[in-house]
């Protein structure tokens, strides 16, 4: 195990340890634009009595930390981790949905007015990706995604620029 090889004692071996964060970020930079997705690490505190509440709390926090930092794939050591992964994924998407919906709707309004000189396509793309991941995970419905003003077919392109180009054609 990586953290053990780094000399980190068992009580502090978890995916949010700085050694793990640095290793993941180095991998992210090294693999940028290759299509390789990095997965979060597992929580080593198993949800078995008497540790169930503490294990679920740690796992929920670990998964949430990974999602907040852009790691959308994960794996778990124990089937008892699945409820907290499910809860963390849904909580992540549902908590960010209102702001993402408003921002994406506003991005398209501003982009359509700006014409060819739109500065922040990367953020628009990140919001399209967010909504597609939320839909794929089941955290939101197509009706909730439609609150952005995008049609299901526009969102399914997965491309902010394709949507923008299609609207200006």
Sequence positions of predicted segments:
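Expand to "…catalyze enediolate/carbanion chemistry for C-C bond making/breaking, isomerization
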Residues: 1-169
């Amino acid at each position: 195990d990586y953290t053990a090889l780094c000399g980190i004692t068992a009580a502090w071996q978890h995916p949010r340890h700085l050694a793990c964060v640095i290793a993941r970020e180095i991998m992210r930079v090294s693999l940028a634009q290759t299509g390789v997705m990095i997965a979060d690490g597992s929580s080593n505190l198993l949800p078995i009595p008497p540790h169930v509440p503490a294990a679920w709390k740690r796992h929920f926090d670990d998964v949430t930390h990974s999602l907040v930092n852009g790691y959308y794939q994960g794996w778990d050591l124990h089937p008892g981790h699945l409820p907290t992964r499910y809860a963390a994924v849904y909580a992540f998407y549902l908590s960010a949905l209102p702001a993402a919906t408003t921002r994406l709707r506003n991005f398209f309004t501003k982009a359509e007015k700006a014409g060819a000189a739109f500065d922040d396509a990367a953020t628009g793309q990140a919001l399209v990706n967010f909504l597609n991941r939320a839909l794929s995970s089941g955290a939101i419905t197509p009706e909730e995604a439609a609150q952005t003003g995008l049609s299901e077919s526009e969102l399914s392109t997965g491309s902010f620029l394709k949507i923008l180009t299609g609207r200006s054609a």
